[in-house]
Each structure stands twice: as structure tokens, then as C-alpha cells.
């Protein structure tokens, strides 16, 4: 959980939360420090228009990323850093990965370049709860993330579903709709990322988020979901658990971004190929030549020459 080269401001936005939420957040930050974790970097990714920037603003408690329903997302990633009680929180907001029904390779390359020499402690993969179905685009996004940062990034991942203050269709119970929506999305993510079901990476936690100012509140003035959960402390608690799991954080270096060099990879096989050629081709041919020489009948002129010399 490396430190990042970034202007770090005091996390004053935490004071805008309800006192009960502040207490829980400071307790969670204290738990991280007890584990010698003094900084945390969260990478926020997903399709466009799913609420990534709003989620960053909600976690920080400030309007740190500009958002507008009438404007497209910013073309470049933004890292916001805040410090509190000796702990530094870095959150990286990124542009959507889909453009015109395909992966936006330009946006993906910009994101990878931005992340060079940074460490990803948690991936927050954002989508919407009120999306009724999954499709091939979800699979493409999961594949693009995996191809860029490796399968290991899903060991440090959380799926976050926004627009959680949502009434399911046809009177379906809220928890049942959430369960079905979560499993459908996780199944596509596993498929796109080529994850095995029995692998740790398949056990990706799913959290609910409601960024609207109209979010309901409990008696402690905390923002709560229809299931009664105070979502900001629950999200930060899940982030803490993922950050402290046994999987390693992802350090983004040039080799990770560029992938294996096919030319260099081919060079590694050259000595083995030569050895096999010698064993299975050159050596047998050499033996055949020697045998032919040994059994070859000498021509008459060579025999005469030998007799004349005598």
C-alpha cells in the first residue's frame, strides 16, 4: 500500500457525515492503522453513466469530482487524496470504458498510463442496481480490466451497485431483486475475467450505494438503504476487509501494462529448440553418415592406387 505522489488535503469532508457515521469511519481507519496500513488507494472503474464520480464524492463527503447529467464524463482519470489522523485515502475516478458499444481503447490506455507506478489496494467496480439485465458489454469490461491488470485484481475487488433506493418491478422483494441482480452481474464478471468459480476471486463482495441527496435516513441521521443498512459505513467496512485480505495489492508497472514481450518470450525457447534439433535430427543424421562411410565399398581406382603404391 505504497504512498502516492499527490497533493494530500485534510479530510474535512468526513465532518459532513452524521456523528454515528463519523465514529464508524474513524474506527475503521483505526483498524487499518493497527495493521500498519497508513494509506489506501481505491480504483473506481466501470461503464459510463453508472455513478462512479458521484460515488467518489459521497465517500469523500465533498464535491471533489465535477458531474453533470448533461455532460459526458471527463476524458482523464482523477485522483483525490485526503488525510485524517495520520491515514491517507486515495480514490481514483476513471472515465467509462465503453464507447459506441465497444471498449474505449483510448480511455483504457489513458487509465493505464495514469496508474503507472501506483499501487491498487481495492478495485471498486461500479454498475447500477436498477439495470434489469446484463449483456456482452459487461463481459467486455471485465475482460478489459483483467487483460490490463491481471486476474489478481479481482481478489481485491468490490462490486458496487448504485441507485440503490430503487423499488423492484412487479412487487419483487428488495433483497430478492438485489440477490438476483448481484449474481447475474457476478456471473458475467467471472466469465469475462475467466475466473474459476472455486477461486477466491469469485468471492467478490457486492455493496449497495445511493448517492442521491434524497436518500432516506435513520434515527441517527445516517443515510440508509431500503434494507435499513447505513451504506457509507458498510461500504468503507467492506473496503477495509478487502484491503486486509490475504491477496497482494496490484502494483502497476510497465511490464504489467505492456504485458509479456512476445519477442523476448520467443527467445527463451531458442536454446531448447536447438537442443531438440540436435538430439532428434542432427545426432541421428551424424550416426547414419558415419555408418554409411564405414560400410561404403571403395571404388576400383582407389584399390588400384593402393596396390600400385605397394
Curated annotation (Swiss-Prot):
Asked if the record carries the keyword GTP-binding, the reply is: yes
Q: Which GO terms describe its molecular function?
A: GTP binding; hydrolase activity; identical protein binding; protein-transporting ATPase activity
Task: Map out region (Homodimerization) in residue numbers.
Answer: 68-71, 128-133
Transmembrane regions: 269-289
Q: Which UniProt keywords apply?
A: Chloroplast, GTP-binding, Hydrolase, Membrane, Nucleotide-binding, Plastid, Plastid outer membrane, Protein transport, Transmembrane, Transmembrane helix, Transport
Instruction: Spell out which residues lie on the membrane's Chloroplast intermembrane side.
Output: 290-310
Annotated stretches, region: G4: 162-165
Q: What segment(s) does the record annotate as region G5? A: 210-212
What EC number(s) are associated with this protein in UniProt? 3.6.5.-
Please list the residue ranges annotated as the AIG1-type G domain: 37-260
Summarize the impact of residue 128 to A.
Answer: No dimerization and reduced GTPase activity
Q: Which family does it belong to?
A: Belongs to the TRAFAC class TrmE-Era-EngA-EngB-Septin-like GTPase superfamily. AIG1/Toc34/Toc159-like paraseptin GTPase family. TOC34 subfamily.
**Name of the protein described by the UniProt record:** Translocase of chloroplast 34
Q: Which gene encodes it?
A: TOC34
